[in-house]
Amino acid sequence: MKILLANKFYYRRGGDCIYMLNLEKLLKAHGHEVAVFAMDYPENLDTPWKKYFPKNMSKLMAFTRPFGSHEVKSTFKKLLDDFKPDVMHLNNVHTQLSPVMAELAHQRGIKVVWTLHDYKLLCPRYDCLKNGNTICETCFNGDKKACLDNKCMKGSKLASFIGYKEAVVWNRERLEVC
């Protein structure tokens, strides 16, 4: 089976990265053909798939990435054209890569599996903590506006606005069809 793994980082940075690297190794050991898609970072492990990795972005361009930037879409489509996966496995893809990959794969009839390593689909801040220390479930009802009121993202109105917009764009209803 041809399996495409996606994660924003392709090096041992955190639990999601270690999980994906171990999964890649395990899938290959069981005879699957595996491709990877990640952001282009100097710390990345070497891979023949790095030519498809979107380049790191300026702070100005960072505003477009959560919504599926042109570069992410074009490099990802090229990888889909060249590799032709049977299944795509998303991991930690929010912000830098974005869930747009699930839509693009689904449009081509590619099955999509997504391992959620955090609470991003429930909470724009990822961790369900108000100000980093109080458990918060305010956004669970689907209304993410509390993110703006509480400046949940880095204590910043601007970062919280981007987090809010990302949560509104990539809502459950939009993603569950993938």
For the regions a language model picked out, list residue spans one by one.
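N-terminal subdomain of nucleotide-sugar transferases
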Residues: M1-P42, D81-F83, Q107-K111
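Short aromatic-enriched loop/helix-cap "lid" or pocket-rim segments at secondary-structure transitions
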Residues: C17-I18, L45-K50, M101, P124-L129, ...
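Short, well-ordered alpha-helical microsegments
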Residues: M20, Q96-P99
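A conserved catalytic-core segment of Leloir-type glycosyltransferases
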Residues: K25-V87, C128, D143-N150
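Short N-terminal targeting/anchoring amphipathic segment
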Residues: K77-L97, I110-T115
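Catalytic-core regions built around general acid/base machinery
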Residues: V100-R108
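Membrane-proximal helix-turn-helix segments that form the acceptor-binding/catalytic region
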Residues: Q107, K120, I135-C178
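A short, histidine- and acid-enriched strand-loop-helix "catalytic/donor-clamping" loop
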Residues: L116-Y126
